[in-house]
Structure formats: C-alpha cells, structure tokens
C-alpha cells in the first residue's frame, strides 16, 4: 500500500520549464581574412663608409625632423622626418660590409600593410573600411586600422586587388617586418538576433516558438541570415 501510494504521488515528472528570451539587436559583420607584412609609413636609407664616421651613431633612437643623424668627415646626415634610426648590414656582400654600413631612418608612428584581396570580394572593398589587426608579439591584442587605398585594377596573374591597410603605431609595439593577421570588416549592420539554440530546422524552413500577448507559444516561420557567437540574425518573421 505504501509503495503504491508513493508510486502514484511521485512517478509523474513535471513538464520541462521553458526559457523565454527576448529578441535583441546585435552587430553583425562580414569579414575578409588575409595576412601581410608591416612596413613603416616612411623610410630613408643612407650608405656610410666607416672611415667617415667621427662620432658613434646612436641606433634605435628617436629623432626629430632636422636633427643630425650622423656627423661625418665631409658631411652631415640630417633627418628629413621624425623617425627612428636603425642599422642594416650588407650581408649579401661581405667585402662591402667590412667597410660600409647602411643606416635606416624609419617613421613607425604609422604602419601600413599591403594585401591582396580575392576578386570575389572586390565589390565590398571601400576606403575607410574598419580592420582588425593582430600579430604574434601580442597575440591577445587587437589593433585597429582601416583600408587606406586600393589599386585601380585587378591583377590578371593573381585575380586579386592590391589593397593597402594603414594603422596608428604611436606605441611602437609593431616593428617593421612583423607578420600581421588582417581582418577587413564589411557590411557591418545592426540586426535583430536570437539564440541559435531556439531555432527549429525543418527541411529548408526555420521556425521558432514565439510567445503572444496571451502567453501562448506559436510556431513561427522566420528567415535567418548570418550566425555569430551563439546568435543567429533574423531577417524576417519577427517584429
């Protein structure tokens, strides 16, 4: 008797709870992913014979336009713009490298990166498009840039469009020659979104359950767009 009493009282499970979530507007965007090499916005090179040098040259130092970079026997090298002094050896010619040095003056306050955009994405490329930039030196940091310019025609050899990305680099964290990961954003828009787990796919159709003013769940057909981090874009079907 006791067993039957508890069986009748507790054998039925309560209906599962329903989680109701309001549709919200979110930012959706399409991304073109590519890569390239960082280059200084301005650079100037000077070949100097070692016997000319009167005073040691201070490398990796910031200079202003008009500063003296190097005092030589018969001349002075003057900075034509603000930048950083660097040195590069003539590694390809050992005889020359014994007697000469190559000084670089580089303006790294801004960095540019030339990339090739596949032909299929060319209609979306516009000057000023936002760009996210990453490089291995700071893996978790995202730098911001934009599309600065692009070629007037598509390359027949690569079927791509030469495009220049530019970014501020006042911190000096990105060095010329760094390998950069580029994400160009286009068609950035604010759209209605819902959790992707709330959708029901039946063949080519997508449905959700929408709660009406009487607190009843109505099966509703919707048209979806892109997906982004657990959410799906709703193009039609929800007001």
Question: What are the functions of these language-model segments?
Answer:
Residues 45, 60-78, 94-115, 130-132, ...:
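Short hydrophobic beta/alpha edge segments that flank linear recognition/processing sites
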Residues 19, 42-64, 75-91, 96, ...:
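Short beta-strand segments of a lipoyl-like beta-sandwich/carrier module
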Residues 41, 56, 88, 105-108, ...:
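Residue-level recognition of beta-strand microenvironments
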Residues 54, 166, 205-239:
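Acidic- and glycine-rich mobile interface elements
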Residues 1-35, 39, 45, 124, ...:
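Acidic, gly/proline-rich low-complexity N-terminal segments at the extreme N terminus
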Residues 23, 36-38, 52-54, 85, ...:
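Conserved hydrophobic positions within beta-strands
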């Amino acid at each position: 008797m006791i067993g039957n009493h508890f069986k009748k009282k507790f054998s039925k499970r309560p209906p599962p709870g329903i989680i109701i979530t309001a549709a919200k507007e979110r930012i959706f965007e399409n991304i073109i992913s590519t890569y390239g090499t960082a280059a200084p916005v301005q650079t100037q090179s000077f070949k100097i014979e070692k016997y000319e040098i009167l005073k040691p040259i201070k490398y990796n130092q910031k200079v202003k336009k008009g500063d003296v970079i190097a005092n030589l026997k018969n001349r002075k090298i003057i900075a034509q713009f603000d930048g950083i002094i660097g040195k590069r050896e003539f590694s390809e010619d050992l005889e020359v490298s014994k007697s000469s040095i190559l000084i670089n003056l580089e303006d790294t306050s801004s960095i540019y990166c030339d990339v090739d955009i596949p032909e299929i994405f060319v209609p979306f490329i516009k000057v000023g498009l936002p760009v996210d930039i990453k490089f291995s030196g700071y893996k978790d940091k995202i730098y911001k840039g934009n599309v600065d310019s692009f070629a007037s025609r598509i390359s027949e050899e690569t079927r791509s469009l030469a495009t220049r990305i530019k970014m501020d680099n006042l911190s000096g964290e990105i060095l010329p020659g760094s390998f950069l990961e580029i994400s160009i954003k286009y068609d950035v828009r604010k759209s209605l979104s819902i959790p992707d787990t709330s959708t029901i796919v039946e063949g080519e159709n997508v449905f959700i359950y929408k709660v009406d003013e009487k607190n009843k769940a109505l099966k509703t057909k919707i048209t979806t767009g892109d997906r982004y981090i657990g959410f799906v874009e709703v193009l039609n079907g929800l007001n």
